[in-house]
């Protein structure tokens, strides 16, 4: 199991494949995605890596976090996230992961926070059909109707579809295809929509319901450098 990455959603556009077909894509950008810390079985009880992306102002970073980033020899990060990995894919602290971590045609799972819609009615939130427009209907056109039964059971069951806060929840979309990557600009183009607004942080992982392509780099797609080469060598042993 490889590490995932943290990317920022830039928006949607379109590209054309070799057959001339129009493909809607979401553009995700990876910016300074470094390994900030390790989690090992001996010390933490599980194996994972903590990644950080973006840049945060030093004055807006707490003293504890400044020490955390200094220990990893990386600049303060705007976003941190942990990814579970197998022991053979554990990355060294300080290495940088690039967009080449994924390959074209690969399936990935993306996780983000959906766009908040505020307090919404049942017709918008749950796609209810609503009531009649006339013939005796009075101000209940968009109402959800009855909420329960009678004295028995005498309550509203949990999970009843009603009006309420819509959106702004953690959403994972599975098996999205990677159309292409651009390592120089740190871009990942994935087919279709991705949960979240423009500028939102998105977690991208290898799909759990699809096999990993044979040409996918292991333990990760790393930036060329002394630390990266050392980590890749250790991972291949």
From Swiss-Prot:
User: Where would one find the signal peptide in this protein?
Assistant: none
HAMAP family per the UniProt record, alphabetical: Ribosomal_uL3_B
Entry keyword set: Methylation, Ribonucleoprotein, Ribosomal protein, RNA-binding, rRNA-binding
Record's NCBIfam families? L3_bact
Asked if the record carries the keyword Transcription, the reply is no
- Recorded source organism is Brucella abortus (strain 2308)
GO terms for biological process, alphabetical:
translation
Q: Which cysteines are joined by disulfide bonds?
A: none
Q: Which PANTHER family match?
A: 50S RIBOSOMAL PROTEIN L3, LARGE RIBOSOMAL SUBUNIT PROTEIN UL3C
Free-text description of this protein's post-translational modifications in UniProt: Methylated by PrmB.
Q: Molecular function (GO) terms listed?
A: rRNA binding; structural constituent of ribosome
Give the InterPro entries listed for this entry: Ribosomal_uL3, Ribosomal_uL3_bac/org-type, Ribosomal_uL3_CS, Transl_B-barrel_sf
Which SUPFAM superfamilies does the UniProt record give?
Translation proteins
The region called Disordered is annotated at 133-155, 213-237
State the oligomer form and interacting partners: Part of the 50S ribosomal subunit. Forms a cluster with proteins L14 and L19.
Q: What does this protein do?
A: One of the primary rRNA binding proteins, it binds directly near the 3'-end of the 23S rRNA, where it nucleates assembly of the 50S subunit.
Protein family membership: Belongs to the universal ribosomal protein uL3 family.
Ranges of biased composition (kind: Polar residues): 135-150
Provide the positions where the record notes the PTM N5-methylglutamine: 151
Q: Name one GO cellular component term.
A: cytosolic large ribosomal subunit
Q: Which domain of life is it from?
A: Bacteria
- Compositional bias of kind Low complexity: 220-237
- The identity of this protein, by name, is Large ribosomal subunit protein uL3
Q: Does the keyword Secreted apply?
A: no
């Amino acid at each position: 199991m490889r590490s995932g990455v943290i990317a920022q959603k830039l928006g949607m556009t379109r590209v054309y494949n070799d057959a001339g077909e129009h493909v809607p894509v979401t553009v995700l950008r990876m910016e300074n995605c470094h390994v900030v810390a390790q989690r090992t079985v001996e010390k933490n009880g599980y194996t994972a890596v903590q990644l950080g992306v973006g840049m945060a102002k030093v004055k807006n970073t707490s003293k504890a976090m400044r020490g955390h980033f200094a220990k990893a020899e990386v600049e303060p990060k705007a976003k941190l996230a942990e990814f579970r990995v197998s022991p053979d894919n554990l990355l060294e602290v300080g290495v940088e992961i690039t967009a080449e971590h994924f390959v074209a045609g690969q399936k990935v799972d993306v996780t983000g926070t959906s766009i908040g819609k505020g307090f919404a009615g049942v017709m918008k939130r749950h796609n209810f059909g609503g009531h009649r427009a006339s013939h005796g209907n009075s101000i209940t056109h968009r109402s959800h109707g009855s909420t329960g039964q009678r004295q028995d059971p005498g309550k509203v069951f949990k999970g009843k579809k009603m009006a309420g806060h819509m959106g702004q929840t953690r959403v994972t979309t599975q098996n999205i295809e990677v159309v292409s990557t651009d390592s120089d600009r740190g871009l990942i183009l994935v087919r279709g929509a991705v949960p979240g607004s423009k500028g939102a942080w998105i977690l991208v992982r290898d799909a759990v319901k699809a096999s990993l392509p044979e040409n996918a780099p292991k333990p990760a797609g790393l930036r060329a450098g002394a630390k990266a080469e050392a980590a890749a060598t250790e991972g291949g042993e």
